[in-house]
Regions:
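Conserved GNAT acetyl-CoA-binding A-motif
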Residues: 85-96
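Glycine-centered recognition micro-motifs in short, flexible terminal segments and loops
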Residues: 67-78
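C-terminal "cap" of GNAT-fold acetyltransferases
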Residues: 121-146
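Conserved acetyl-CoA binding element of GNAT-fold acetyltransferases
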Residues: 56-69, 95
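Conserved beta-hairpin
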Residues: 32-49
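Conserved active-site alpha-helix within GNAT-family acetyltransferase domains
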Residues: 99-116
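Short amphipathic alpha-helix that is part of the acyltransferase structural core
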Residues: 1-29
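Conserved catalytic-core motifs of GNAT/GCN5-like acyltransferases
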Residues: 95, 113-128
Length: 146
């Protein structure tokens, strides 16, 4: 009988430094912020999604997000639980390139609104959208218990 090959499971990763490295490869110019908290998702030992939360002020926390592969429910739950259950903020905010239609669509599916457009603010001269997910607008069922 042949043994099954070993597989590396998908898993959450909380190494903020490694998550910043993943994000910087996708968000040129991203700077580290002291006290930031990272949540990543590895598949087969490779980071495929990551978020870093920073500038928590009691009401809002900002996130930098990059996603290379379809999201797992477990990563999404951790991503949403951190700001709303752990930090207990009213709003999660992030800057999204206007050209990143995939991330903007995901934000809208979760209940986020596009609060502002920063014309010409992107490195390439494109626009940047400020997306805000208010606790009361959250459409994802993973926080039903909160």
């Amino acid at each position: 009988m042949r043994a099954k090959p070993a597989t590396v499971a998908s898993m959450l990763d909380y190494d903020t430094s490694a998550i910043y490295t993943f994000l910087r490869m996708r968000i040129p110019g991203l700077l580290s912020t002291e006290g930031a908290v990272g949540i990543g998702w590895k598949r087969g030992g490779v980071m495929v999604a990551g978020a870093v939360f920073e500038q928590h002020n009691g009401r809002t926390v900002w996130a930098h997000v990059a996603i290379d592969a379809p999201l797992s429910r477990r990563f999404l739950r951790a991503f949403l639980d951190y700001p709303f259950a752990v930090c207990a903020v009213d709003a999660l905010r992030g800057y999204v390139l206007a050209s990143n239609t995939r991330l903007r669509a995901l934000a809208r599916r979760l209940g986020a609104v596009e609060e502002a457009v920063l014309a010409g603010a992107a490195r390439d001269g494109g626009d940047v959208v400020v997306c805000t997910l208010w606790r009361g607008n959250l459409k994802h069922d993973t926080l039903a218990q909160h």
